[in-house]
Curated annotation (Swiss-Prot):
It comes from Pan troglodytes. It comes from the Eukaryota. Pfam families: GSHPx (PF00255). Catalyzes the reduction of hydroperoxides in a glutathione-dependent manner thus regulating cellular redox homeostasis. Can reduce small soluble hydroperoxides such as H2O2, cumene hydroperoxide and tert-butyl hydroperoxide, as well as several fatty acid-derived hydroperoxides. In platelets catalyzes the reduction of 12-hydroperoxyeicosatetraenoic acid, the primary product of the arachidonate 12-lipoxygenase pathway. This is Glutathione peroxidase 1. Coiled coil: none annotated. The modification N6-succinyllysine is found at residues 86, 112, 146. Homotetramer. Interacts with MIEN1. GO terms for biological process: arachidonate metabolic process; glutathione metabolic process; hydrogen peroxide catabolic process; lipoxygenase pathway; response to hydrogen peroxide; response to selenium ion. The gene is GPX1. GO terms for molecular function: glutathione peroxidase activity; phospholipid-hydroperoxide glutathione peroxidase activity.
Amino acid sequence: MCAARLAAAAAQSVYAFSARPLAGGEPVSLGSLRGKVLLIENVASLUGTTVRDYTQMNELQRRLGPRGLVVLGFPCNQFGHQENAKNEEILNSLKYVRPGGGFEPNFMLFEKCEVNGAGAHTLFAFLREALPAPSDDATALMTDPKLITWSPVCRNDVAWNFEKFLVGPDGVPLRRYSRRFQTIDIEPDIEALLSQGPSCA
């Protein structure tokens, strides 16, 4: 069994986990988001799709946040070292470099974490177990073995920056999307969940 899976195995929903905000302060319990639809992405500020995905994350949060969507971003440096800034440097990198132009995320960003390997954040260990492969590309894998910097390697590992996990209002992961699936194209799935109304979970 891959490391961190044991810690996540007993969890039934994302509400069992917490993460520290990028700006610092006390950890945020995902249980505080009960009843919301969550879109969770591992992000990086120096990736080829940073501009596209960050701006689309902002757009979804702007349009659907008032109806119950919460977008959560987790910076990760495990893929091509494309999030090599310190936590306190990431917001300035986004504002002045990429996407640049004064960009500010309107969604929740958390401290850098690992999503694969022995040091994986328990939330991502849980998400990977719940949804072992992206629904749009079940064979998605890290394409260059030289870039694998973690151990152990598992079949359900996140393959690159900007993989997405959609979580229902009961905290149960519903769908995983590959890096190639544009963030904005998840909107119909989010809309379907929002139209179901609040959960009593």
